[in-house]
A protein has these predicted regions:
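N-terminal subdomain of nucleotide-sugar transferases
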Residues: 1-64, 239
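Conserved donor-binding/catalytic core segment of Leloir-type glycosyltransferases
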Residues: 3-7, 211-236, 249
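Carbohydrate-associated surface elements
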Residues: 42, 168, 189
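An amphipathic, basic-hydrophobic alpha-helix
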Residues: 66-96, 107, 115, 146-150
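Nucleotide-sugar donor phosphate/pyrophosphate-binding loop at the beta->alpha transition
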Residues: 77-83, 119-121, 129-154
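An aromatic- and histidine-rich active-site surface loop
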Residues: 97-118, 122-131
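A short helix/loop element that forms part of the nucleotide-sugar donor recognition site in Leloir-type
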Residues: 196-211
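Nucleotide-activated donor-binding/catalytic signature segment of Leloir-type glycosyltransferases, i.e.
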Residues: 252, 258-268
Length: 268
């Protein structure tokens, strides 16, 4: 049976879009007869044992601090995760390493893959330096921004295969000189079976939220610039021309929440 070790920033039982995508990938691989495990780095901060099962998937943890000034701290973090990967590979003998964003995970997996002679798949879910700019924790073209991008490029160049979650990320890599033939796209998706039978509409809830009687477009996520909510707001007047009385309901929080409220009022 083929074995794949997934190298992760964090995982179940924590809940996030990151962990839900990971769960879907690992479950799909299990369905295909592939044996999978996950290994998280130092940024998985939840309490728990060093080896933990969640939803039928076994996860291993990397322990210990990575101290020091910025830059050196991340380098030590990569080294510690690489050591964990090598140790687990000696015990479990995976056929493939599958590293997921951020580049810190990719760099650690690349180091271990080269040492052990194991093929590496690197999956990019976002460019984290751009995400930091979008959520206000980073600045474009800063030293940290440029170093993060250089590290990403290093991992992409060394990986045996590269996966992105969308065409935009692939196009960005191609613009940096990466061969398009090396990049596959694996978009996000939803397993409708997990939702069960559709729940009947609740008239009282519709009235309380002032959703009217027409179709409702819902968004559950985070209010950040890169989520594209501005496009959704701009599309609502166009949708109203083809759909009778559409409504839009958001369930989220984030730094640009007030901006979206102003945009909504401007279209009212």
């Amino acid at each position: 049976m083929t074995r794949v070790l997934h190298v992760l920033d964090h995982s179940l039982p924590l809940h996030s879009g990151y962990t839900f995508r990971t769960r879907a990938i690992l479950k799909a691989q299990q369905t295909c007869g592939i044996e999978v495990r996950g290994l998280t780095g130092l940024r998985h901060l939840a309490d728990g044992p060093d080896m933990e099962e969640a939803e039928g998937i076994l996860f291993h943890r990397t322990r210990g601090p990575a101290s020091g000034p910025a830059g050196l701290r991340e380098w030590r973090e990569i080294a510690r995760l690489a050591e964990s990967i090598e140790k687990l590979c000696e015990q479990w003998r995976p056929d493939v390493l599958h590293a997921h964003s951020p580049a810190l995970c990719g760099a650690a997996a690349l180091r271990a893959a080269r040492k052990l002679g194991i093929p590496l798949v690197y999956e990019i879910r976002a460019f984290w330096e751009d995400a930091a700019v979008g959520n206000g924790t980073g600045r474009e073209n800063s030293l940290k921004y440029r170093l993060t991008r250089r590290l990403e490029d290093h991992v992409v160049a060394g990986a045996d295969a590269v996966v992105t979650i969308c065409q935009g990320l692939k196009d960005d890599l191609v613009s940096r000189g990466v061969d398009a033939e090396r990049i596959n796209i694996s978009p996000n998706g939803v397993d409708l079976a997990l939702f069960g039978a559709p729940v009947a509409a609740d008239p009282a809830l519709r009235k309380a939220l002032d959703l009217g009687t027409g179709p409702v477009i819902g968004f559950i996520g985070s209010f950040y610039d890169y989520e594209g909510i501005d496009d959704l707001i701009a599309a609502m007047p166009l949708l109203s021309q083809v759909i009778p009385v559409p409504a839009c309901c958001w369930l989220a929080a984030g730094r640009v929440r007030r901006h979206y409220r102003r945009r909504r009022r401007s279209l009212a």
